[in-house]
């Protein structure tokens, strides 16, 4: 599976293929001609170097990500992994026959070419796809979220991971028996797909929240306890919810774990103009100017739901009871009006909040404040204040651990509104863990299932993991990397060079050694996992060394400390 955070994709190794001088010259001519036709902003020079090196050294992995490329040349035929995420590609060339992994996330693709039968992982998140080609029989992972898909082709029997959220699907094809993770939230689904009725050994997690499903099939109750199914945010009737509650509360219930929300079936889709919702947070003497500014954003994506979120936020217990809350929101809205990127991120975060209960709105407010702080860090606010950046990183780390703890707690409950669980840990531990982004009150703590003992255990776990893991985590944190790129450019370049040298000289052998030691040579799944582990270990080592060097210099200058008392 391709990583979404600090590590690159796992990779797999192909046998070396000898290329003669004639084919070398021919391919280099193709690359040279392609490089000459570069458009402004493209980094085809870097791409040329990586392509020629990959071809001449018969490297299994070709990484052309983050180069603003608008097209690709003919690809080396021997590669088994192609990474071209974060470019401006509108199409892909013919794919190599032995390709196993393709990552083309965050491009402008409207179609993708015929897929080779060898492909096991396809990741084309955040493109403009309206349909997919026939899927190869060996495919185990398919990530196509945030596209424009109206339907899916038949799913391969070996498929284990399927992400299709933020599309336009009204139905899903039958689900393969081996499917473990399905993320189909935020579509237009009106019915459930056909589930496998076999007894399962592996846990299955299926997410259908925020669709248009109104009823549940009778077979739903026949599923075994290996299933975790999220149906929150669907227009389910009160009768259906009551039936589910009776079913899951039975002492002899051994069926699936079902997630719902406190306001299912009661969503209110009415909203007022965005500018009106925003100006309501400002003093009367500022409202005219604010309204004029925000009128320009009325047609941005998720503007309507953001308007509804602001109205819901004003009705939370924090808005009513917390001194200075309105001023805090107004200051935040001013920052959004000045940054299109931050506004886009915030609109997206708030998109789901109006379709659930008040505590969902409160949790979303927490997440929006996190988004603001991380954005400010990435944009340079803390470039000259490493102590403040460390404090922010420490808070983000604590929140991440609390999310892990909440996730584990949710697994112990049968009929769960998971929002209440997540918010309970943040709200009830906000003071003890110094969580500046957490609201101090919530409405439905009583139904969260979180006990006083849970909170004591959580606090102890956060502090223990912080002591042992924080510096490693911080060394891989995106905002810290952004600071290093700006303020320590030479050191950062050296670290990146170390990483690419490892990819060229050590990576394949380390993966092969790991597979051999575990007796899993030739196992594609094990190969991907081993590749991801090797890559993460390498990045951890390189970035930790860089982090230690920079922090030792900066903290000694201002008297700050890395370790928190």
UniProtKB/Swiss-Prot annotation:
Source organism of the structure: Shigella flexneri
EC number: 2.3.2.27
Residue segments, region Interaction with target proteins: 1-262
GO biological process: effector-mediated activation of host programmed cell death by symbiont; protein ubiquitination; symbiont-mediated suppression of host programmed cell death; ubiquitin-dependent protein catabolic process
Catalyzed chemical reaction(s): S-ubiquitinyl-[E2 ubiquitin-conjugating enzyme]-L-cysteine + [acceptor protein]-L-lysine = [E2 ubiquitin-conjugating enzyme]-L-cysteine + N(6)-ubiquitinyl-[acceptor protein]-L-lysine
Record gene name: ipaH7.8
Reported impact of residue 143 to S: Abolished ability to ubiquitinate GSDMB
Purpose: E3 ubiquitin ligase effector protein that interferes with host's innate immunity. Functions to alter host cell physiology and promote bacterial survival in host tissues. Catalyzes ubiquitination of human gasdermins GSDMB and GSDMD, promoting their degradation by the proteasome, thereby preventing cell death. In contrast, activates host cell pyroptosis in mouse cells: catalyzes ubiquitination of mouse Nlrp1b allele 1 protein, releasing the cleaved C-terminal part of Nlrp1b, which polymerizes and forms the Nlrp1b inflammasome followed by host cell pyroptosis.
Main location per the UniProt record: secreted
Protein name: E3 ubiquitin-protein ligase ipaH7.8
Primary enzyme class: transferase
Keywords: Host cytoplasm, Leucine-rich repeat, Plasmid, Repeat, Secreted, Transferase, Ubl conjugation, Ubl conjugation pathway, Virulence
